[in-house]
């Protein structure tokens, strides 16, 4: 397993909840890179657009940095980590304010080449 090349792309502080991103990442995990692109393009989730940019970046990294075969690429790992939160206040009645947070997310996509099994 040590000789397997991996292409990685990350985005930090994406302004979307990690829960919402993880729902979309579950759809593409383990799929071929081209199939994952199609899934993300036709998804109506807002997170899909952000993840598509990260996936395209990982595919470009695989081709230019490592010379990997684009037809053999698949999504080896895809995960979202909790980023920092931005605390905000919403004004409510009687001069009060209720706190809420904007959650930020770190998204990572790792691509590998599929190995042909010897028979």
Question: What is each model feature region?
Answer:
Residues 34, 87, 99:
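Short, electropositive, low-hydrophobicity segments enriched in small/polar residues
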Residues 86-96:
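Short, low-complexity, polybasic intrinsically disordered segments
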Residues 95-103:
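C-terminal structural segments of small proteins and small subunits
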Residues 1-80, 105-119:
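Ribosome large-subunit tunnel/peptidyl-transferase-proximal elements
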Residues 81-85:
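Short, charged/polar surface micro-motifs in flexible loops or helix N-caps
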């Amino acid at each position: 397993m040590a000789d397997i090349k991996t292409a990685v792309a990350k985005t930090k502080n994406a302004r979307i909840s990690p829960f919402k991103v993880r729902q979309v990442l579950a759809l593409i995990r383990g799929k071929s890179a081209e199939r994952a692109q199609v899934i993300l393009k036709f998804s109506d989730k807002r997170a899909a657009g952000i993840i598509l940019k990260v996936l395209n970046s990982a595919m470009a990294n695989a081709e230019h940095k490592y010379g990997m075969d684009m037809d053999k690429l698949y999504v080896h790992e895809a995960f979202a980590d909790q980023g920092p939160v931005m605390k905000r206040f919403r004004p409510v009645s009687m001069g009060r304010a209720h706190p809420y947070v904007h959650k930020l997310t770190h998204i990572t996509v790792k691509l590998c080449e599929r190995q042909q099994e010897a028979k």
